[in-house]
């Protein structure tokens, strides 16, 4: 299955981002993205979608109820044909509409923290009496940025040297994902939540996490069911199918290119399943992890680490059903940081 690298969750001047569509495409090209999914707030500028300067540009939307106070419940809607903003006050009605349009619904930044210094509210998801969502955003770069910005000094450090502070998804978000996985399949995505905002404190001004930087940071690696052909509709649908199936992993490529990372189930030399797939318990079933870079590889079963190895590969014989997923960590600037999170293999 061909691997393509892209970014999900970015904003333009159509809502509260600082970059126009041509500018955001240029940033995507600089980062060598194969695809980019924009998610402007409460609007759906469909006419911008298409192949733009070699980048597959998919237009989705991030919907929320602007009248709700405090603010919460942001939903990323991909593959929808109509603007569903009017349904924002009812999360369940919104989810039902996304599914009627054969779209994909992902809960954005389900867990958030907001220190007082940022003057920004935390915007978590709070209404969990819902059904019909496809997954959650387990790593939101802007959310982590906000959580670490506890003082002017730390904010300046984040603005100019984010990789010295950013370490990975919130533990609370990963725990939430594992709890949800006990009863349903939940696809994990990650993204930058790119806005290109400016930080101003007195005479100092800095762009907060510029688009070109963010597009090299938390990225989505999909395994498509066919190679891109250059036909927009066909290639867009291939990306959306891969996301729906969970045929993807999330990677912090700013600390090491993860292209080629693989997690699969084998019986002997026969590959039976990959990320997002299900496989039955059987004799000689083995889970295999391969990494293009040396890393601290961790295999989790139902949220608990069952095997850990530092290196380029990991193998584990499986006799027990459950949800298996992989986390990988690498050292960067003297600190262990999250690098790769795979979607699960479901052993039934």
Give the residues covered by each predicted segment.
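C-terminal functional module detector
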Residues: 1-3, 23, 183-188, 192-348
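A metal-dependent hydrolase metal-coordination microenvironment
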Residues: 1-155, 167-183, 191, 197, ...
């Amino acid at each position: 299955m061909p691997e393509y690298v892209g970014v999900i969750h970015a904003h333009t001047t159509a809502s509260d981002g600082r970059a126009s569509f041509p500018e955001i495409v240029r940033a995507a090209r600089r980062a060598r993205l194969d695809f980019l999914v924009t998610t402007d707030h409460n609007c759906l500028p469909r006419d911008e979608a298409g192949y733009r300067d070699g980048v597959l540009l998919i237009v989705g939307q991030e919907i929320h109820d602007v009248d709700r106070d405090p603010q919460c419940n942001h939903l990323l809607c991909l593959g929808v044909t109509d603007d569903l903003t009017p349904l924002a006050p009812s999360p369940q009605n919104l989810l039902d509409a996304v599914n009627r349009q054969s779209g994909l619904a992902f809960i954005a930044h389900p867990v958030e923290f907001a220190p007082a210094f940022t003057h920004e509210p935390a915007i978590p998801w709070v209404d969990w009496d819902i059904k019909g969502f496809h997954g959650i955003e387990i790593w939101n770069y802007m959310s982590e940025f906000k959580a670490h910005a506890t003082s002017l000094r730390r904010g300046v450090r984040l603005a100019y040297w984010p990789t010295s502070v950013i370490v990975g998804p919130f533990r609370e978000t990963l725990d939430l994902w594992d709890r949800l996985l006990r009863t349903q399949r939940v696809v994990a995505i990650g993204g930058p939540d790119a806005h290109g905002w400016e930080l101003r404190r007195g005479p100092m001004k800095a762009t907060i996490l510029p688009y070109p930087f963010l597009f090299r940071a938390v990225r989505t690696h999909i395994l498509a069911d066919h190679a891109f052909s250059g036909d927009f509709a066909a290639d867009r649908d291939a990306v959306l199918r891969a996301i729906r199936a969970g045929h993807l992993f999330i990677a912090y490529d700013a600390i090491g290119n993860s292209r080629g990372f693989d997690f699969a189930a084998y019986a002997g030399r026969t590959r039976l399943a990959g990320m997002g797939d299900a496989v039955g318990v059987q004799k000689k079933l083995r889970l295999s992890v391969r990494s293009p870079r040396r890393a601290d590889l961790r295999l989790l079963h139902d949220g608990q680490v069952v095997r850990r190895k530092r290196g380029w590969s990991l193998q584990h014989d499986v006799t027990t059903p459950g949800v298996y997923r992989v986390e990988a960590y690498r050292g960067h600037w003297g600190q262990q940081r999250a690098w790769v999170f795979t979607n699960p293999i479901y052993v039934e």
